[in-house]
From Swiss-Prot:
Belongs to the bacterial ribosomal protein bL28 family. This is Large ribosomal subunit protein bL28. Gene3D superfamilies: Ribosomal protein L28/L24. The keyword Metal-binding does not apply. Residues 1-22 have a biased composition (Polar residues). The gene is rpmB.
Length: 96
């Protein structure tokens, strides 16, 4: 399981710990990932995704999983999220 968000693509970054004496040691900055179940209103199903806490806030801010995926840039999404986005686009196009 990779350490990256399925919705925003946020992943591991590297940097330095810097001491008071300015000694530098390498370290990793890990994203705050959560395993969550999100509901798609258009598809009427639940989906388990591994998302960052910031992405979860963005999903709630935009009004749900469907609205977030429709506005999201497809290059940042994981393959599962891309397939989900395409299903939502098809379903909303048929309904309209």
């Amino acid at each position: 399981m990779s350490r990256s968000c399925e919705l925003t693509g946020k992943g591991v970054q590297s940097g330095n710990n810097v001491s008071h004496a300015n000694n530098k040691t390498r370290r990793k900055f890990l994203p705050n990932l959560c395993d969550v179940t999100l509901i798609s209103d258009a598809l009427g199903q639940r989906y388990r995704l591994r998302v960052s806490a910031a992405a979860l806030r963005s999903v709630e801010h935009r009004g749900g999983l469907d609205a977030f995926l429709l506005k999201a840039n497809e290059t940042e999404l994981s393959m599962r999220a891309r397939l989900l986005r395409r299903q939502i686009v098809k379903k909303t196009a048929v309904a309209a």
